[in-house]
């Protein structure tokens, strides 16, 4: 009879050490966000993978800042894609089972999941088509979570959120690019006002981080942000909490814009079909 040489204790110790290594990587990556270059790498990854938690986006940015499309080995294989020999996997955290502590609070275990970027495979890399500026501007304005009112305004005013009226005021006769950036900034403020129950440590800085990710997603120019002094003063866990709020706001904005873009594409397709 074949003897089972599997050492459960050694396996558990190996998995524990791996988790500790990944948790340490998250802490180190968080602390490095005071470096503007590291912050921009993180924000770039977070906007590409807007549904990833902050911790997992930090992990991806630390291990593969150029990542654009991630999947585990089995998923790539199911798609008929081969991972290149010698490719180094990217470790992220995957929620495991929940459990109850003695004080009644609920904890959750984590497993390590190993991913590979499309650049580590034999799959062709393609960039998604960007909408034209006019279509993007229409989608952004239509994605507002509050009512929109067009106004005549001189000067360089583009858009502003009025918290008292729960209304977005948008200037007429602006270029599509002006509308895209200006309205996105106002929408972020509207979502912060209507969706957040607890005020962030630095609302203006959070808005700038969210707007930078949105501008990156849609190919719009914007000055690169940095963490504010108040954000830098937060401990690592609290800072990730702030960034998680920013991530949720940004992801919500993206989902709303993508929904409107899909409607506009469908309407345009219908117009072409009728011709």
What are these model-derived regions, one by one?
Residues 1-275:
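N-terminal accessory/interface modules of nucleic-acid-binding and processing proteins
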């Amino acid at each position: 009879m074949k003897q089972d040489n599997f050492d459960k204790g050694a396996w558990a110790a190996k998995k524990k050490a791996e988790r500790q290594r990944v948790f340490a990587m998250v802490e180190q990556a968080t602390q490095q966000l005071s470096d503007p270059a590291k912050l921009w790498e993180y924000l770039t990854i977070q906007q590409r993978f807007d549904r990833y938690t902050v911790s997992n986006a930090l992990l991806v940015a630390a291990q593969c800042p150029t990542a654009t499309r991630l999947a585990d080995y089995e998923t790539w294989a199911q798609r008929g894609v081969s991972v290149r020999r010698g490719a180094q996997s990217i470790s992220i955290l995957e929620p495991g089972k929940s459990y109850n502590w003695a004080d009644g609070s609920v904890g959750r275990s984590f497993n390590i999941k190993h991913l590979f970027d499309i650049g580590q495979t034999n799959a062709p890399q393609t960039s998604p088509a960007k909408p034209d500026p006019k279509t993007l501007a229409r989608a952004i304005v239509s994605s507002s979570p509050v009512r929109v009112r067009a106004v005549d305004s001189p000067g360089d005013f583009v858009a502003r959120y009025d918290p008292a009226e729960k209304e977005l005021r948008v200037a007429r006769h602006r270029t599509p690019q002006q509308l895209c950036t200006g309205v996105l900034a106002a929408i972020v403020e509207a979502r912060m006002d209507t969706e957040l129950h607890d005020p962030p440590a630095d609302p203006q800085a959070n808005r700038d981080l969210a707007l930078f990710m949105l501008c990156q997603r849609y190919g719009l120019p914007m000055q690169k942000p940095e963490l504010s002094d108040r954000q830098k003063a937060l401990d690592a866990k609290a800072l990730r909490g702030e960034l998680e709020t920013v991530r949720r706001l940004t992801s919500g904005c993206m989902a709303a814009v993508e929904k409107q873009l899909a409607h506009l594409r469908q309407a345009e397709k219908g117009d072409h079909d009728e011709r």
